[in-house]
Swiss-Prot record:
The lineage of its organism: Archaea, Nitrososphaerota, Nitrososphaeria, Nitrosopumilales, Nitrosopumilaceae. Belongs to the class-II aminoacyl-tRNA synthetase family. PROSITE patterns: AA_TRNA_LIGASE_II_ALA (PS50860). It catalyses: tRNA(Ala) + L-alanine + ATP = L-alanyl-tRNA(Ala) + AMP + diphosphate. This is Alanine--tRNA ligase. The keyword Zinc applies. Residues 872-881 have a biased composition (Basic and acidic residues).
């Protein structure tokens, strides 16, 4: 939908779309900007330019237009106080990790809190009406601007003011009146300073008019009136109209404080710490001039570097001032911003990694580390985390609860970054030789090798960071796209009655509603369909084998083998009870292991994915490192302790909003639940999840859980494979048998080694006797030595390194026509040793090199003595045969 076309139509009828009661009562005048043509509403009859192009743009820097001064946290208290006083419910922020939307990794706007996906539609579910929320939002498209422009953040607090007029809320008149009074009454801004600009919003098939409100060129908020759906000209009014007013809390603080940048009034005491580190006074005329120029020009140019050059020129900044003041200050702001974002994200369960949304988090931490390194700063990240959390904890108490988790994860990630620097340096040198990389190549270097463009710039591999780098990277890793499932001709069929959610009979009768090749649809079924990582039930229908069961929307489809019944026929159905029981135990075990992992490892543990079949199951969890044997044992012990305590496994249904408010968003371990009524499976307070799977009645029904294997399957994800119930007992039995077998093998091996050592000791004593026999031409084959005249070969396991050296050396020392070659095992290596007398005609070096090469190794020496070896034990027989033929002929 073309926003310009919508705006053109709406602006042609301002009384219908924009002219609210406040404008009439206060005497606002509608004007068209003399420069860009945009329509705006103002009380200043002399104003001819819109806020973007006005002469007063960013004039509040150094001279705030408010009668009161509030920093970041104080500004929220003022906003909250105003809206609560005006009959709004203040709602706590939602997580920045968007668990309730499968198309987003992070919460990008306050209205996202209340959006739920139902089929192909996005619906709104508000916990109160009207409400206000201090929603922390994460956006990564403008990372290159953070710290530089004075107003760009990677995370920011969107003040969400939301109302549904048709359900007891209010509409345009009240909304604009409230926002105007918030500015003028609560913050003491002169009413002549407030300007409203006409705009529109469109997305997700819906659209509506909006009014952006500005003070001295700074956009403080945007009131969106989501009212229509469909295409322009053919649109209809939504059943549920919604007010979506989003305002920037950081900007409210900035307008009241008038600091050179928004960063100066939003990070609290962390700024004092950082400014003290670099010895710069942030409240200086130079900084005010520079950042005012940046703010004025940033929206008029695509190239940030060009904006900076222009700001330097207009503010009269020297190269020395740029180097000693501006650049370090930009670094300080970047550190403060990125660290705050990481604190929120990790608190809410995200991990820095090289997959999904974790890309952006790792990128920010590496930017922090690179900035600290570049500026040669002595900073303790833990101290900075404490400063952030202590400043924010009154507004966001959850940050205080997770501060230690944040510290440990960032410490681990920073250590990995340091370890990777040697590799990064080698890669950077190659990049430098190759020439300036493209944006796509820079993205590849980061994704494949973890090399940030800041690092490449620091080591002079690139001269500038492309302004589009972070926006392109963000586009790749901001949302999760789901694959479409195959469709079947199921039109007109009713929803399948799900008996497995009722009495769950293992035998039942049902009517065949439709036959599609080897698949049938019944009017009701007890066969659980594949879903939520749980494999389907098997069994029989009308005597035919059920080999698969899938769910398509609300219709369950059964795939049969050997034939199908006729449409309209009533058939007897039987579920494989043993298979169902095993899968059910594995599913509840998955919940138990998830809870156990979280208790043992940390609060950042979330289910990444899961699979439950009848003979095995697996759970992939979000974790930063491979698991140690001790951690695995602790998780297994904790899981079996939950089984021993025989907790009841309760299933209850809640309205989705009620479930979220009651239990939080940790219920979405298995992903988004696209239904209004949510099925909650709870094991006391240990694990509470929204889940559609089959479960045991009590944890004791599982009897036993055994973790069979763990591995780190990708960065930030660890897989635990396990069995439960009868399969666990069978596994335990097999492990005991295997342990017994290994113990017996160890004893046998020990005895064999002991026997070999005894034989080797005896062999050493026999050296003089064997020498006499060989020199006398006697047969020594019974002693494991083959001879041809005075030429000898052995591959007997009774002879060790000592024997070969002494026997061979003494043999050729006594007879110059003699030669000796031995092949023997020495640990994991097979060795060859060759001695040859001067008149033997044997070249020791040639034999040793040849045999060693067969064994995949190398040999060395001269014609009289040589040795070598290799580790390819599969070639042992070939090596022995070749050595024997080379010396004996």
């Amino acid at each position: 939908m073309d926003k310009k076309e919508i705006l053109k139509e709406f602006s042609a009828d301002p009384d219908k779309y924009y002219n609210v009661k406040l404008f009439q009562e206060q005497g606002f005048i509608r004007k068209s900007c003399a420069k860009c043509g945009r329509f705006f509403w103002t009380l200043n009859a002399d104003r001819d330019l819109c806020p973007d192009d006005g002469l007063d743009t960013y004039s509040f820097i150094g001279e705030p237009p408010t009668s009161k001064r509030f920093d970041y946290t104080q500004s929220w208290k003022q906003v909250e106080e105003f809206f609560v006083k005006n009959n709004h419910t203040s709602v706590s922020r939602y997580p920045v990790v968007c668990r309730w939307r499968d198309d987003l990794y992070f919460t990008i706007a306050s209205v996202v809190d209340f959006q739920r996906v139902m089929g192909s539609k996005v619906v709104f579910e508000f916990p109160a009406n009207p409400l206000v929320v201090p929603q922390t939002c994460l956006r990564f498209k403008d990372l290159e601007n953070v710290g530089v422009t004075g107003r760009h953040f990677s995370s920011f607090c969107m003040i969400g003011q939301h109302s549904v007029p048709d359900l007891g809320g209010y509409w345009k008149d009240e909304c604009v009146d409230l926002d105007y009074r918030l500015l003028t009454e609560q913050f003491g801004i002169n009413k002549d300073e407030v300007v409203f600009v006409e705009d529109v919003w469109a997305g997700g098939g819906s659209f509506g008019p909006s009014l952006e409100y500005f003070v001295q060129g700074l956009e403080l908020g945007n009131a969106v009136f989501t009212e229509f759906q469909g295409e322009l000209g053919k649109h209809t009014t939504l059943d549920q109209r919604v007010i979506d007013m989003g305002a920037g809390l950081e900007r409210f603080a900035w307008i009241t404080m008038g600091t050179p940048t928004a960063y100066d009034c939003c990070f609290g005491p962390i700024n004092e710490k950082l400014f003290g580190t670099i010895g710069i006074d942030s409240d200086s005329e130079i900084l005010r001039k520079y950042f005012t120029e940046i703010a004025k020009e940033i929206d008029h140019y695509d190239d940030l570097n060009q904006v900076r050059r222009l700001a330097v020129k207009n503010a009269g900044i020297t190269d020395e001032q740029m180097q000693k003041m501006i650049t370090p200050l930009e670094g300080m702001y970047l550190i403060a911003d990125h660290l705050r974002t990481l604190i929120f994200a990790i608190t809410d369960g995200a991990l820095p990694s090289n997959v999904g949304g974790g890309y952006n988090l790792r990128m920010m931490l590496r930017r922090i580390n690179a900035t600290i390194s570049k500026l040669n700063l002595k900073l303790n990240i833990d101290d900075l985390i404490d400063l952030h959390v202590d400043y924010l904890k009154d507004t966001y108490p959850e940050l205080d609860e997770k501060r230690d988790d944040v510290k440990s994860i960032l410490k681990l990630e920073s250590a990995r970054y340091e370890e990777s620097k040697v590799h990064m340096k080698k890669k950077a040198d190659k990049i430098k030789e190759k020439g300036a990389p493209s944006v796509d190549e820079l993205i590849t270097y980061y994704e494949s090798d973890g090399i940030t463009p800041e690092y490449l710039k620091e080591v002079d591999a690139i001269s500038e960071i492309p302004s589009s780098f972070y926006s392109k990277l963000s586009d790749l890793h901001q949302s999760d796209k789901k694959k479409a499932i195959a469709e079947l001709p199921l039109e007109g069929l009713p929803e399948t009655e799900t008996l497995f959610y009722q009495d769950d009979p293992m035998e039942f009768s049902a009517k065949v509603l439709k036959v599609i090749d080897d698949m049938i649809v019944l009017d009701r079924t007890s066969f659980y369909a594949r879903g939520g990582g749980q494999e389907p039930d098997f069994g029989s229908i009308a005597g035919f084998k059920v080999i698969n069961v899938d769910k398509h929307a609300d219709i369950i489809v059964h795939q049969l083998e050997g034939g199908v019944p006729k449409e309209g026929e009533t058939v007897s159905c039987k579920v494989d009870e043993t298979r169902r029981s095993n899968i059910t135990k594995n599913h509840t075990s998955t919940h138990i292991i998830n809870a156990s992992s979280r208790k043992v490892l940390g609060s950042w543990i979330w289910q990444h994915s899961a699979f439950k079949d009848d003979d095995h199951a697996r759970l992939d969890i979000t974790h930063h490192s491979s698991l140690s044997n001790d951690e695995v044992q602790k998780i297994e012990d904790e899981a079996n302790d939950m089984i021993k305590k025989n907790y009841p496994v309760k299933i209850n249904y809640y309205d989705r909003g009620t479930a979220e408010q009651k239990y939080g968003f940790r219920i979405y371990q298995g992903g988004v639940v696209p239904v209004k009524s949510v099925r909650i499976v709870s094991i006391e307070d240990k694990d509470i999840e929204a889940c559609g799977g089959t479960h045991v009645k009590k944890t004791g029904d599982i009897e036993l859980i055994k973790i069979t294997k763990t591995k780190r399957i990708q960065d930030g994800v660890v897989r635990l494979e396990f069995v439960s119930g009868p399969n666990a007992f069978e596994y335990e039995k097999q492990q005991e048998q295997e342990s017994k077998r290994k113990a017996e093998e160890a004893v046998a091996k020990e005895q064999l080694e002991k026997q070999r050592e005894e034989n080797k000791s005896k062999a050493r004593e026999k050296i003089p006797v064997l020498l006499e026999k060989v020199l006398a031409g006697e047969d020594v084959e019974s002693d494991g030595i083959n001879t041809k005249g005075k030429l000898c070969f052995t591959a007997s396991s009774d002879y060790d390194d000592y024997f070969h050296q002494n026997f061979g050396k003494k043999l050729v020392g006594k007879d110059s026509t003699a030669a000796f070659c031995g092949v023997f095992e020495a640990g994991p290596t097979i060795r060859v040793m060759v001695f040859s007398g001067e008149q033997s005609g044997v070249n020791a070096g040639e034999i040793a090199k040849k045999i060693a090469s067969i064994l995949g190794g190398s040999g060395g020496g001269d014609a009289k003595f040589a040795q070598g070896g290799g580790k390819d034990t599969s070639k042992k027989d070939e090596a022995i045969s070749k050595a024997k033929s080379m010396i004996l002929g």
